[in-house]
From Swiss-Prot:
Organism phylogeny: Eukaryota, Metazoa, Chordata, Craniata, Vertebrata
GO MF entries: peptide antigen binding; signaling receptor binding
Biological processes annotated in GO: antigen processing and presentation of endogenous peptide antigen via MHC class I via ER pathway, TAP-independent; antigen processing and presentation of endogenous peptide antigen via MHC class Ib; immune response; positive regulation of T cell mediated cytotoxicity
Membrane topology: Single-pass type I membrane protein
Span list, region Alpha-1: 25-114
Protein name: Class I histocompatibility antigen, Gogo-C*0203 alpha chain
PANTHER family registered for this protein in UniProt: HLA CLASS I HISTOCOMPATIBILITY ANTIGEN, C ALPHA CHAIN, MHC CLASS I-RELATED
Keywords annotated in UniProt: Disulfide bond, Glycoprotein, Immunity, Membrane, MHC I, Signal, Transmembrane, Transmembrane helix
Amino acid sequence: MRVMAPRTLILLLSGALALTETWAGSHSMRYFYTSVSRPGRGEPRFISVGYVDDTQFVRFDSDAASPRGEPRAPWVEQEGPEYWDRETQKYKRQAQTDRVNLRKLRGYYNQSEDGSHTLQSMYGCDLGPDGRLLRGYSQFAYDGKDYIALNEDLRSWTAADTAAQVTQRKWEAARVAEQERAYLEGLCVEWLRRYLENGKETLQRAEPPKTHVTHHPLSDHEATLRCWALGFYPAEITLTWQRDGEDQTQDTELVETRPAGDGTFQKWAAVVVPSGQEQRYTCHMQHEGLPEPLTLRWEPSSQPTIPIVGIVVGLAVLVVLAVLGAVVTAMMCRRKSSGGKGGSCSQAACSNSAQGSDESLITCKA
């Protein structure tokens, strides 16, 4: 089974942007739902976070003093009280549905009531530069392992094990994939367009990377060349090393793109080279904020100082996100889009699990 990549949420549509509008590059919206049971300590904790591209814009935590959908970006704060009331009710319904689903899944896997278990989901959509759907997602996981996922065709499911196959058969009989596809091709796309327009000064900006190459001797015979990209947005970037024009991907150490803590990102790629041959190696960088690809070499006369503070901040943020990611892999309850102002999941749909229907795993989107 393919690896599921977590990320996503959704709201009520008040107006669609024209299909002719274009944006630089592709954009994405992801919602992540996580429910963690805690036997003997009350109801499961439910957390939802939503992202547009690399920017978190909404959050809900059932453990908050007054649980509500909370804005996490200035451009979503302009949504009115009714919007936030709908979001809050949606999350509260989802929390209750997940409570039932956790109990059902525990039965599927013949687990006792003593241990803590985690139900996670991710859903959302990607748009191309023309504002049209590139890819839709609806993925679920249980206890950190894949459970079931909507395939790229948005018409079929991939189940991870025999328990998930039971869910798959029920969903196929109920034509759940059609409901998911209608949402992903409809409301998901429309809301992402809306957010991109409302937050265009932030979401559609392109900040080029600050670049340099550092040299780190390993011995008398070898050294590490590290190519740095700092302070860039959006997060998508390409770093490669070449030796005499030949790609060195197999020998390159490449870290994941990391948040810098200020809304930008950082990344580096390193290669070990024979001492004295450093000038044969070039770092090649491509990013939306660059007018053209960059080619960099180590300059022995100007060894730059590595900005340790910025790196430490980025690592700290990465750790926080990693912890959150461990609490968020991909499992939830969502229902079909109802059009108009009801959103895409009704109270009745979210409570189906009480009657034993696996349709309730489909996530609530409004």
